[in-house]
Amino acid sequence: MSALTSQLEEFRRCSTAEQYFDLLDVDYDPRVVAVNRLHILRFFAEEIAGLHDGADAEVSPEVLLRDYRAALIRAYEAFTTATALDHRLFKVLKDRAPEPAGFVPMSEITVERPATTQTDEKGQQR
């Protein structure tokens, strides 16, 4: 068994974020992972699910591990530049998403002024 195949098998046995980071040799700040662990793992899972159209068995271990590493980096960086609320990966956060404020362009705004009354020379309203 090659070292890459062995590493791929080890990847499949990983169960913590730190194990993925260590195995794929991705630097990380433990504080970022501690706060965003589930969100990073969810983002990572979604990223790898979209790789190779589900045909991982047909892809070499070297390519798989390279692509998994890139996906983990994307997942991690997503939470170093934004928050879990920004990404809303979990249903509980999606359900609490604020409704976007309605936008009314200036061209649609009209002003109606009350009719003014005018008087003639005799003081009567017209």
Swiss-Prot record:
Annotated Pfam families: NifW (PF03206)
Swiss-Prot/TrEMBL keywords: Nitrogen fixation
Annotated spans, Disordered: 104-126
GO biological process: nitrogen fixation
Source taxon at top rank: Bacteria
Family per similarity comment: Belongs to the NifW family.
Functional note: May protect the nitrogenase Fe-Mo protein from oxidative damage.
Alphabetized HAMAP family for the sequence: NifW (MF_00529)
Subunit structure comment from the entry: Homotrimer; associates with NifD.
Protein name per the record: Nitrogenase-stabilizing/protective protein NifW
Name of the gene encoding the protein in the UniProt record: nifW
